Amino acid sequence: MSRLRALTASLALIAPASAGAHQLNVFASVDCEAVLVEAKFSNGRAPVEGKVRVLDGENTLLTTLALEADGTRRVPLDGLDHSGGLVIEVDTGSHDDYWILTPEDIARHCGS
């Protein structure tokens, strides 16, 4: 019986750690010409594949692009209506996360 309690206690400690080990983290920055999207799992590894969806401030899909092999994607601002800000979503199939760029974020990095 004590072996069962020890096993149960061990599993209780391990399960939360392994559940959080694969959280996807997304970051996006602007250099005035493009948005640079970076996606990494909480263990530091880049996703092998995934999609980047760019939505406007009203959640209208503007474009969908594939992630590069290093977990990044450069999204040109030319042709995107970013006046209301942008929502950058990354979906790897089993994990997803997003980053919000406000109009102020974009203007600040573009010097306007």
PLM ranges: what are they?
Residues 51-64:
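Short amphipathic beta-strand segments in non-cytosolic proteins
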Residues 82-96:
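Short, aromatic- and glycine-rich surface loops/edge beta-strands on solvent-exposed regions
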Residues 19-36, 40, 58-59, 100-112:
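Beta-strand-rich domain onsets/edges
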Residues 63-77:
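Glycine-centered loop-to-beta-strand initiation motif
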Residues 1-8:
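Bacterial N-terminal signal peptides that target proteins for export
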Residues 14-18:
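N-terminal signal peptide c-region/cleavage motif recognized by signal peptidases
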Residues 42-48, 81:
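A short beta-turn/strand-edge loop motif at beta-sheet boundaries
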Residues 23, 34, 47-51, 85-87:
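Exposed beta-strand and adjacent loop surfaces of beta-rich binding modules
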